[in-house]
Each structure stands twice: as structure tokens, then as C-alpha cells.
UniProtKB/Swiss-Prot annotation:
Protein name: Uncharacterized protein YMR295C
Family assignment from sequence similarity: To yeast YGR273c.
UniProt biased composition (Basic and acidic residues): 14-31
GO biological process: regulation of cell wall (1->3)-beta-D-glucan biosynthetic process
Signal peptide annotation: none
Taxonomic path: Eukaryota, Fungi, Dikarya, Ascomycota, Saccharomycotina
Gene Ontology cellular-component annotations: cell periphery; cellular bud; cellular bud neck; cellular bud tip; mating projection tip
Residues with PTM Phosphoserine: S11, S23
Record-linked InterPro entries: DUF2406 (IPR018809)
């Protein structure tokens, strides 16, 4: 096995020369300012996450930028609630003021899907602006010719009844009347035998 040795004269001179070179380098103030470590120059994922917009802020920017996706507050200067079509809501629903009172329940779900995805297919499937609460034209009426007024309410035929949708059956339980036969029956004990007095 071989051993390698350093020459002492070369190693001493190289160490001595390196120390002299480090002391000879001068850094100017401009270089110090340019090379100073700053947090803005460091790629820090936590700082990037803090400085980026929140999801609701991004959604608000999307609604303002994309006219296909109207928000409920698209008329911000008037502060009027609007439906997904941008139409002002004149009669709001009691439980959800961001939908019209006569909006179809399935349309509420479809409008949420449209607001989230922005897909115009959902907007095309909405029926409320066309029909309101009217029955669809292709709905089978099974021989009963029901006509509807401009508000989508069924019109009265004959005017005899004051109720709009006809008489609804109300459940009434049977009246239990005790007859004399039931009162005369004597109580029997175990195995059908008469009780002793």
C-alpha cells in the first residue's frame, strides 16, 4: 500500500497566499446593498400563500371579469339582489333571499351548479324565467283541461268553489261509541273463567 505525502513548502505557501488574497478583496457599499439577503428575494411558499388572493376574492374577480357568470350582487351600485340571469329579484324567497319566490326548486340547484362551474349548459336548463310556477306544456293533464293565467295560477272554472285547488280530503278518525253490549260484558280472568267476587 502506498502513502502519499504533501510537500510542506507548497502547502505552507498556498495557505499563506490564500489568507493574503481574502484580506485584499474589498466590497463596496453598492455591492453590499445589492447582495443583501431580503425576504422578498427568497422564494418562500408560506409568504406566497399569505400574499395570494383568498378563494372568495378570486371568485369575486371572476364574476366581475366574466359576464357569463353573474353574481347575486352584480348591480352593486344599487345593492339590488339579482338572480343568476342578472334580473333583479322583485319578490324574494323568505328562506333564501338570493332566489325569487316563484323559482322552481330544481332551478335553485341548477343555478348553484351554474354559479360554481360557470358552464352555460346549466343556465340553458333553467326553466323559471320561461315558466315560473306554471305547469310545463308537455306535462300530461290526463283529460282535465286546466288553464292558467298570466301569473301561472290555475283559472277557476264555474266559480262554484272558493278554494283554488279543489277540496282536499281531511282525515277524521272514527268515533268510538260504547254500546250497551260492551258495558254488560263481565270481565273474565285468566283462561276465560269468571272472576270471583
Amino acid at each position: 500500500m502506498m502513502h502519499f505525502r504533501k510537500k510542506s513548502s507548497i502547502s505552507n505557501t498556498s495557505d499563506h497566499d490564500g489568507a493574503n488574497r481574502a484580506s485584499d478583496v474589498k466590497i463596496s457599499e453598492d455591492d453590499k446593498a445589492r447582495l443583501k439577503m431580503r425576504t422578498a428575494s427568497v422564494a418562500d411558499p408560506i409568504l406566497d400563500a399569505v400574499q395570494e388572493a383568498q378563494p372568495f376574492e378570486q371568485a369575486a374577480d371572476t364574476f366581475h371579469d366574466n359576464m357569463n357568470r353573474q353574481s347575486y350582487f352584480s348591480n352593486e351600485e344599487g345593492h339590488v339582489l339579482c338572480d343568476v340571469f342578472g334580473q333583479p329579484i322583485t319578490q324574494a324567497d323568505i328562506s333564501n333571499p338570493t332566489r325569487a319566490r316563484d323559482e322552481r326548486p330544481l332551478d335553485t340547484i341548477r343555478s348553484f351548479e351554474y354559479a360554481v362551474s360557470g358552464d352555460p349548459v346549466w343556465a340553458q336548463q333553467l326553466e323559471t324565467p320561461t315558466y315560473g310556477f306554471r305547469v310545463r306544456p308537455d306535462f300530461p293533464v290526463f283529460g282535465a283541461a286546466v288553464t292558467y293565467d298570466a301569473n301561472g295560477m290555475p283559472q277557476q272554472v264555474g266559480g262554484a268553489s272558493s278554494q283554488m285547488y279543489g277540496e282536499q280530503a281531511v282525515y277524521q278518525p272514527q268515533q268510538h261509541v260504547q254500546t250497551e253490549e260492551k258495558q254488560k260484558k263481565k270481565k273474565k280472568g285468566l283462561f276465560g273463567r269468571m272472576k270471583k267476587k
